[in-house]
Amino acid sequence: MKHIIILGDGMADWPVKSLGDKTLLQYAKTPYMDKLARMGRNGRLITVAEGFHPGSEVANMSVLGYNLPKVYEGRGPLEAASIGVDLQPGEMAMRCNLICVEGEILKNHSSGHISTEEADVLIQYLQEKLGNDRVRFHTGVQYRHLLVIKGGNKELDCTPPHDVPLKPFRPLMVKPLAPEAQETADLVNDLILKSQELLKNHPLNLKRMAEGKDPANSIWPWSPGYRPQMPTFSETFPQVKKGAVISAVDLINGIGYYAGLRRIAVEGATGLYNTNYENKVAAALEALKTDDFVYLHIEASGEAGHEGDIDLKLLTIENLDKRAVGPIYEAVKDWNEPVAIAVLPDHPTPCELRTHTSEPIPFLIWYPGIEPDEVQVYDEVAACNGSYGVLKEDEFIKEFMK
C-alpha cells in the first residue's frame, strides 16, 4: 500500500461568532474531506508536546513521528538544509524573517509578503554590510531567510514574530537563557538594530513605500539550533523505499531533507492562497507512481490565519478540498495498488489570535477496505467522536503506516 499525507497548514481554528459559533472547518464546504471522514476513521492528534512552542517545525515533525526531546534543534537548521546550507560543527542557524517595523512597533512578520526576488536584494545587501567570517546571511523564500553564526550559543529566548503583531519590538528582542549565551544574544540584537539603520532608506524599500507596500526594514532572527541528528523515514518504516515531500516552505523541505524524502519543486507553488494546487496535485500523483510515501504540505490556510482573514481562510480550506483532496482521491481510489490518504493540519492557527495554538488537531485516515467509524464530517468537533480517540507522539504515523 502507498501512503499520502495531505496537510493543510494551520487549518484548524476556534469557533467564530460571525459564522454562528462554528469553526471554519465546520462552516466551509468540504464535500471530499467529509466523504473521506465518513468512509474512513477519525481522531485527534497532539502535535505539540508538553514544553514545546507550537511552531510549524514542532508540529510537522510530530506528524511524522519524530521524538522531539531527542532530535529537536529548532527551525533554523531545518531551513538551512532546505536551501543547501551545510552546517558545520559549532555553527548555529537561525530563521531570519524580513519584517516590517513602524516606529517602535512590529507591524507584521512578513513585510507584506515580500517577493523572493525583492528579498534577495536586501539579504545580499545585509551580507555585504554585516556579513563576516562569523556571520552569514542566506536568502530563502519570500520573507523567510537564514542567519548562520559561527560559535553561536543556542540557549536564547527568541520570540517568533508572527506571535506578536502590533507589539513593541524592543522588549521582545533576544534574551540569553544562560550566562554563556549573553554574547550571542548581544550579537543578534546588534544585528537587528544595524539592519534597521541599513534598510530604512534602501532604494527597494523607498520604492515599496511609494507603491503603498510595507517596507522590509528589519531582520528578526529566531529559533536557533545546530545540525540535528534525525533518523530517516525509511529507517523508521523500512517498507518505505522511496518518499517525497512537496511544499513551498523551506522549513518543511528541510524536515524532508533530514527525513530522507526527496524534494519535488513545483512551478507556481507560492505558499499563499494563489498557490498552484493543480501543479502540486499533479506532482503528488506522479510521485505516488514510483514512491511509497508522499508528504503534500499546503501552506495557504496557515498564512490566512496569520492575517486574521476569515474569508480568505475559508477560501483556502475549500480550495484544499476541491483542488487537492478531491482530485487526489478521485485519481487513486481505483488504482491497482491501494493508496492510503490522511488529511490533517499541523496545528490550529485561529484567525482571532493570528498565531499558532497547541490544541489537538483533527485527522482522518482512509484507504480501500478500512472499517469506518461513526463520524460523518471532517472538523474539530466531529473528530472528538472518532474511533482513534486522542493520539500522541508517534501513534498517528504508526497507525497510518501499518
Predicted features and spans:
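Feature captures the catalytic ectodomains and active-site-proximal regions of enzymes
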Residues: 1-402
